[in-house]
Regions:
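A short, polar/charged loop-to-alpha-helix boundary motif
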Residues: 88-101, 643-663
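Short, well-structured active-site flanking segments
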Residues: 647-649, 681, 690-710, 821-832
Length: 966
């Protein structure tokens, strides 16, 4: 039996060996053995060695930020400094693999920030405006293209607008946001398997609002710039509150890669007085980064830099020098150890020539003067009952002031509809809501009627609504009406412009002529007719208008005009929304009183500066004043009203409010607002006439009231009266239009008696250029470029024509008048010191040129300017002022429907000028208002009034009567 078993095994073994599978089995066993041995060697014998080699692979140099230099006024008062703060940073640790994971984490992070009134700050140049529309934040067209170029991942802007249409340079802001939402799968696209929407705790997808989406895509976009440097964290929120810090740390397990980091933030003292000058800091834009890297390669996309003002122009001096850390990082960018460190060098300090208290006092003088003008101008009448005389006597109906409380967002219409709304707010909203439904029904009925009423036959209110609908459909955001495709020479277009056809008829014409973009309408059928398109257009339009704040405001305008919403209700709402500090007595009086009391109430609030000219944004609501040292050219004050708080500029909600504010607080009115100078230009004409020999000191020009030596006769302001014979001093004192027209005419006359206007224009330009009016003033912040008139020498001689100058440019000119010929390149900067106080650079104003005119010329011009103050109608403004002032008033009309612009240039003391004061009030009605500001500036500067006197006073007296000769 044993032998049988043995024989059986022998036969079996023989079969196995001779089998073709035997060789394969042997090979498999050998390979398995080799693999096991290799794994044993890798994991057991050399595992630690390989792990070390894997994790400690790269040495990197990580830059550390320097401390930004401080900014001081001329007396050492700190205006800008740094303060310890906490930032939120984010780093890609590799924990999140899918879009859904990333978006969920970022949604949670953004929700925490928003809950505490904060938001993500990113390099994305998109935001929501005050009405909730997505808009670009790029400051220039080239900046927007540079941003888009970076987003597309292109090297230069020339690569955009490719034939495939992948990289359009004209993509709208809303379309760009939609594109980015699809890119990061924040919205459900065509690929249902790539749903990257954030998930709630139950795993359900969340549809995010545009506000949240902008922050999420902004973070992801910004992180792209450190995608290959994962050891670099990205700062996405700065100066967060302690509550936000605690909330983020509490949810740290769900926010992998999110950290709290100590940093510094920029803090501005007395911000409202200096914001237009100092500016603000923020994350560097792509365009600015490109510019900075040409002079300092240390700049990176996450850097905070000066965005405007002195912060921007002195960026390189304030920034300092970055430090560095040398560190080992692993393959996913985690820092393993720091092996070396170079400390950063603090930036230098900048000292301004400006005086804090002078700046502050003038700001409030301007505000109170504007309030005084409004008190003279606002009347308790309806617009239809106000008689128009001329642009110096325009009145503002009180209902327009009431509407501005809504129109300029002093009152929030969203609050009217909120659950927390007061009784009066609910009443206002109920009136609005019932009216809105009625108005929509009337509009639909009119637009759907085959016998629609022509525009000019509609009521004023219905015309306004129809015009708004058309403007909305043709706006850049909506662009259903393609304006570029409209044939403006067609009869239908002309009929529309003339109001002889209805909006319905015009839109049907647009459908037939293919300038209605049907791709943007929800049309189900591929073979739709004109009626289908028009119905879809109306449905789309009215659906949008229900959520459109601007249309809502238009309805409120007519509710106020028609006495449906009353001034009394709106004044009470000022207390409900905490615009005014609660006063129970006033609220009760408003509740039981009528509209006359509401009018007096609002006027008192304007008088007491509880409601400011900037809030109402009525004419006038802006002004500027520049004070210079006549002896040194230093700018002692450069004030723009209104202003803003640059400490809050990183708050996107606040920034949107500033951009929506109709008083334009972000504009520096002293440097950016260009206006014709009016009669303030006449001293230049006088100098040109004397120095060129067109007139002499003894020449008498006989004013007859109307100058008829030109084809378009020029009336003197005294017409039908006349001045009679005047010399140059009298011409300036009386600001005689006839006199200066004759001077310009003589400057335009050749020796042979022929009249050549270009000769006169060239001569006026020559002397204006001597005073620096052909170029910017030299100050270290952004400034609009001036222009000297190139048409009509006679009118140009009086400051009309095409002259355009900013206040700071007129200030340089009058400074040279005051010091008799030293033209300075003005400067806002006194000096630069290092962090230890050592002088680095002196910025004393440079002398641009010295004007070598005859002493008698200076005497005559200065005497004429002195007599403007002592003998002309301006005398009543300066009565009682112990300082001897010389000056020249000026007004300029830009529109017959708005008040004249008001100017006053001056210097004092007349006998030995120390300072010059230049005042500009756009739409300020009369130059007496500008002169009144100057008077109060001199009183304050020379100690006849204190800062407390200014701060504790109410609105200043104003006069809308025109000064003779302006």
């Amino acid at each position: 039996m044993f032998d049988d078993l043995k024989e059986y095994l022998r036969e079996w073994f023989k079969k196995v060996i001779t089998s073709r599978l035997f060789v394969l089995a042997v090979v498999f066993c050998l390979m398995s053995s080799a693999l096991v041995m290799r794994l044993f060697n890798l994991q057991i014998i050399k595992g630690e060695e390989y792990q070390d080699a894997y994790t400690a692979m790269t040495e990197k140099v990580i830059k550390t930020a320097s401390t930004r230099g401080n900014i001081y006024d001329r007396n050492g008062n700190v205006l800008a400094y740094n303060e310890l703060a906490y930032d939120v940073t984010i780093q890609d640790t590799g924990a999140y693999k899918t879009d859904a994971q990333w978006n969920t984490m970022l949604y949670d992070l953004v929700s925490i920030l928003n809950k505490h009134g904060e938001s993500a700050q990113t390099s994305l140049e998109l935001t929501l405006d005050h009405d909730g529309n997505v808009v670009y934040t790029s400051e220039t067209q080239s900046g927007r293209k540079r941003f888009l170029c970076d987003y597309y991942g292109l090297k230069n802007v020339d690569e955009m607008d490719d034939s495939d249409g992948k990289y359009p340079s004209d993509i709208s802001a809303p379309d760009l946001l939609e594109r980015m939402k699809k890119e990061y799968h924040l919205t459900l696209g065509d690929d249902k398997n790539r749903d990257g929407r954030p998930l709630d705790k139950d795993g359900n997808p969340i549809d995010v609002s545009d506000e949240v989406a902008l922050q999420i895509v902004g973070i992801r976009y910004t992180m792209r710039f450190t995608a290959f440097q994962k050891y670099e964290s990205t700062t996405i929120a700065t100066d967060i509150s302690d509550e936000t810090v605690a909330d983020i740390l509490e949810h740290a397990a769900d926010l992998v890669g999110v950290n709290i980091q100590e940093s510094t933030i920029r803090v501005y003292n007395e911000s409202i007085y200096f914001a237009p000058i100092i500016g603000y800091t923020g994350k560097v834009t792509s365009e600015r980064l490109e510019e900075l890297k040409t002079v300092n390669d240390d700049y990176e996309l996450n850097d905070v830099v000066g965005r405007t003002g002195i912060e921007s122009s002195m960026e390189l001096e304030l920034k300092g020098k970055k430090g560095s850390q040398t560190a080992y990082v692993d393959n996913v960018g985690r820092i393993l150890s720091v092996t070396g460190e170079v400390a950063p060098v603090a930036g230098n300090d900048i000292w301004l020539t400006l005086d804090l208290n002078l700046q502050k006092g003038i700001y409030h003088i301007l505000e109170k003067q504007l309030a005084g003008v409004l008190l003279k101008t606002i009347v308790n009448q309806d617009e239809k009952d106000i008689a128009y005389i001329d642009s110096s006597s325009i009145k503002i109906p009180i209902k327009k002031a009431y509407f501005q409380l809504i129109n300029n967002n002093v009152l929030s219409i969203d609050n009217f509809a909120s659950e927390e709304a007061s009784d009066v707010e609910q009443q206002i909203y109920q009136k609005y809501e019932s009216s809105r439904v009625r108005i929509e029904q009337e509009l639909r009925g009119e637009l759907q009627s085959e016998n629609a009423t022509p525009m000019n036959a509609l009521s004023e209110e219905m015309q306004a609504y129809m015009q708004y609908i058309y403007s909305y459909l043709s706006s850049s955001n909506k662009a259903i009406v393609q304006r570029d495709a409209i044939d403006t020479s067609s009869d239908m277009y002309q009929a529309w412009k003339n109001g002889t056809i209805s909006l319905r008829e015009y839109l049907y014409y647009g459908i037939a002529n293919n300038w209605i973009d049907t791709t943007k309408l929800d049309i189900q059928s591929r073979y739709s007719n004109a009626d289908d398109v028009f119905t879809a257009l109306l449905d789309d339009c009215f659906r949008d208008l229900e959520q459109d704040p601007a249309f809502e405001k238009l309805i409120y305008q007519y509710l106020i005009n028609n006495n449906v919403v009353t001034g009394r209700e709106l004044c009470m709402a000022l207390y409900s929304q905490n615009v005014l500090a609660y006063d129970e007595n006033e609220v009760n009086l408003l509740r039981v009183s009528g509209e006359e009391y509401a009018y007096q109430f609002l006027m008192n609030k304007i008088r007491n500066i509880e409601i400011t000219p900037a809030q109402l944004a009525l004419d006038p609501c802006t002004a500027s004043c520049v004070v210079t040292s006549a002896k040194t050219g230093e700018v002692l004050a450069l004030v723009s009203y209104p202003s803003y708080d640059n400490n809050r500029i990183s708050d996107s909600t606040y920034f949107a409010q500033l951009n929506a504010d109709q008083s334009l607080p972000l504009r520096n009115n002293a440097t950016q607002t260009l206006k014709a100078p009016g009669s303030t230009f006449k001293p230049i004409t006088a100098i040109a006439g004397l120095e060129e020999g067109a007139i002499t000191l003894s020449d008498m020009i006989n004013c007859t009231g109307i100058y008829e030596e030109v084809s378009n006769p020029i009336r003197c302001w005294k017409y039908p009266g006349f001045h009679g014979p005047l010399n140059v001093v009298g011409g300036i004192e009386n600001s005689c239009n006839y006199f200066f027209s004759e001077v310009a005419h003589r400057l335009s006359t050749e020796t042979d008696g022929s009249y050549k206007p270009e000769k006169g224009l060239e001569t006026l330009k020559k002397y204006a250029t001597m005073f620096g009016l052909d170029r910017t003033s030299g100050i270290e912040i952004s400034e609009a470029t001036p222009s000297i008139s190139d048409t009509d020498p006679e009118r140009s001689s009086m400051g009309q024509g095409t002259h355009q100058f900013a206040s700071v440019q007129l200030a340089r000119y009058v400074t040279a008048l005051a010091n008799r010929g030293t033209v300075y390149d003005l400067s806002l900067i006194d000096k630069e010191t290092d962090s230890q106080g050592n002088l680095v650079k002196d910025y004393s104003p440079a002398v641009a040129s010295t004007l070598d005119f005859q002493t008698s010329t200076w005497d005559a011009v200065q005497q004429g300017m002195r007599q403007v103050v002592t003998n002309s109608s301006t005398k009543r403004v300066f009565d009682g002022l112990d300082v001897h002032v010389a000056g020249k008033t000026g007004t300029a009309q830009e529109s017959q429907k708005r008040g004249n612009h008001a100017f006053f240039i001056s210097f004092a003391p007349y006998e030995n000028p120390e300072i010059s004061v230049t005042v500009s009030i756009p739409n300020g009605y009369s130059s007496s208002n500008a002169a009144m500001v100057a008077k109060h500036v001199y009183r304050y500067f020379y100690g006849y009034a204190s800062l407390d006197d200014i701060l504790n006073s109410g609105a200043l007296d104003a006069s809308n009567e025109r000064i003779n000769g302006d």
